[in-house]
Design a protein with these regions (language model features):
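Short, glycine-/small-residue-rich phosphate/pyrophosphate-handling segment
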Residues: 93-139, 146-155
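N-terminal beta1-alpha1-beta2 submodule of the flavodoxin-like/Rossmannoid cofactor-binding fold
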Residues: 1-88, 145-155, 159-162, 168-179
Length: 179
């Protein structure tokens, strides 16, 4: 599953995600979820241990691994992503994730904040990720044209994600942990 975190009108996240999805489709079945197109319930309705299923609950639960494309906003990731993570707490558990971040300096602070949150959910984040510096300068007619070396960096992260996804799928099937 590939999750597009930004919901702003003027965003490059979807263009970056489309490029990531095309690369990931060589190794994975990609289910792209754009949070700008999903109506999540208000946080005040969230109940400990779960709430009302959302339009993406089954898609998150059914995925073995995640690619998260997120901007860095104010030295972290956007509230839309935090809401999606918190609302679907159990669905994320014991799986793997790779973060593709972007921002003026590559979005690495968003990645580091996500690592801590995902650790709480027992999500293994790959060591490799991709941080894209000023991706808005790499748009050509709305299509993301990656800078030199970005494809190779993403490829390395996808190899790690594939390894962790397989390992954790096997572990969940053979030795499930209680939630």
């Amino acid at each position: 599953m590939l999750l597009v975190a930004s919901v702003r009108d003027a965003r490059v996240g979807r263009a970056v995600a489309d490029w990531v999805a095309a690369r990931a489709a060589m190794s994975f079945d990609v289910d792209l979820i754009d949070l700008a197109e999903v109506d999540l319930p208000e946080d005040r309705l969230l109940q400990p241990g779960g709430g009302v299923p959302t339009p993406i609950t089954d898609r998150i639960a059914g995925a073995d691994g995640y690619l998260v494309v997120t901007p860095e906003y104010n030295h972290s990731y956007p509230a839309s992503l935090k809401q999606a993570i918190d609302w679907h707490y159990g669905e994320w558990m014991f799986k793997a994730a790779t973060v593709v971040s972007y921002g003026a300096q590559g979005g690495w602070l968003a990645t580091e904040h996500l690592r801590g949150v995902f650790t709480e959910l027992h999500v293994v984040t790959t060591r490799r990720g991709l941080g894209l510096r000023a991706p808005w300068t790499h748009l050509q007619e709305g299509v993301f044209a990656p800078p030199e070396g970005a494809g190779e960096e993403l490829g390395g992260a996808l190899v790690e994600l594939e390894w962790w996804t397989r390992a954790l799928r096997h572990a969940r099937a053979e030795h499930p942990l209680p939630r």
